[in-house]
Amino acid sequence: MGNRNLIRFDWAIKRLLRNKADFTVLEGFLSELLKENISIDSVLESESNQKFSRDKFNRVDILVKNSKGEIAIIEIQNENEYDYFHRMAYGTSKVITEYIAVGEPYKNIKKVYSINIVYFDLGQGADYIYHGKTDFIGIHKSDKLKLSTKQSELLGGKTEPY
């Protein structure tokens, strides 16, 4: 096979899918990945400012807001980073704090999906797509923590913390 110029997925994400006309492609990708219908409202500013000199700079490849007000971070990483899980946690936390105002109730925190496409082994496993989430499991009874009736009412009928 000769030299062919192929478009890499990271190039497409960073350049093509930022256009509103191409949102259907991104919506289809996210809908399949998250197993629910996703409708993108807007592409958000993907670079956060450092508030203090000691803050880490956070830049993601694409940041979108869906019709439910939830945020999806799509990050493409070519270079091996052994502490990439920590980077995911930092990036997600930073986005959460940037989208809630001082004095706003914590119930207004938006759900953030962190979608990471990496071109290296992230860990050891047989699959190539993994879904991680935060669950609270009891130490003694191994039950999954659910919200109380009052908490559920406050959060619009949700039964789980996230």
Task: Show which residues each predicted segment covers.
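Elongated, amphipathic alpha-helical interaction scaffolds
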Residues: 1-162
